[in-house]
Amino acid sequence: MNDCANYMDYILNKLDERTLLEQLAEEASELSQAALKLIRAKGLSENVTPKTEDGVMQNLAEEMMDCSIVMALLSLKDKKIRTAVHHSEGVSENLKWKRWAERLGYEEKK
């Protein structure tokens, strides 16, 4: 087993599902803050920030990775979550894309 797999196993054995869900909520909140900060850093808002766009982009990428890691751990920890995630891939994913596009005014060409 490589180091990463050892770390994952250790974390999965150490933390229960509730703790992982709490961690996901925290990381998702930090991701939200990073996305809002990037809006400001790019000058897309009147409320500018002194932080650089590159620095804020790096923070956003880190928060995205943090969320991905916790989501992966949750899918390994809980069979129901894993099943729901794998079941929703593909068919549901297309429906989500379609709904989003339609909300934005997309019309299928006939």
What is each residue range found by the language model?
Residues 1-110:
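Flexible "arm" and connector segments at domain edges
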